[in-house]
Amino acid sequence: MLKLFLIRHGETEWNRIGRLQGHSDTNLSPEGLQQAQIFVKHLPFQHVDAIYSSDLSRAVETAKVIADKFNLPVKKMPILREMNYGIWEGRDIAELIEESPKEFGKFFTDPERCHPPRGETFLECQARLMIGIREIIADHDNQNVVVVSHGAAIRLIISAALDIPIHRLWAISQVNMAVNILRVENGDFTVELLNGTDHLRHL
């Protein structure tokens, strides 16, 4: 049995102001770094065999705080990046809703049919992410593995693991620095914890 600890990175300034990040490389805010530091003081696990991360700075910085606790390297995987939002990246969500209510509105109301111009669809992103997750599972039977990724990315991984349709994607809560625990046995996924945030009470 493998345990996957899927962790969303800590807060960034763009998270705080409601700006789409996607593949844009942003760093943790001071608050985000503090969230990661609090997390390692209140871990929901005692032992970790490997730590993987998206190669984007906000995820790597989060993973590094956890890795230092266990004296492990961070294995960076570009395949674990956030969804590519194309020309929407770097834009404020509120502005996009106002400017393109029909096209961008699908992002939240009809994600299955949402295709950011020059970006990925949700289904394309999910397929990419699950290639990475399956690689990790194949390499770590009967181990505890941390995977640090992003908000939409983790929702897509969870929806694939639990056969949740894409149109219900945003029903999966996922705040900054949330932890999710998935048990993987014989290719089947079981959720032990979803959007765990108890550690954030200590901020």
State where each predicted segment sits:
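Acidic, His/Gly-rich catalytic cores of divalent-metal-dependent hydrolytic chemistry
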Residues: 192-203
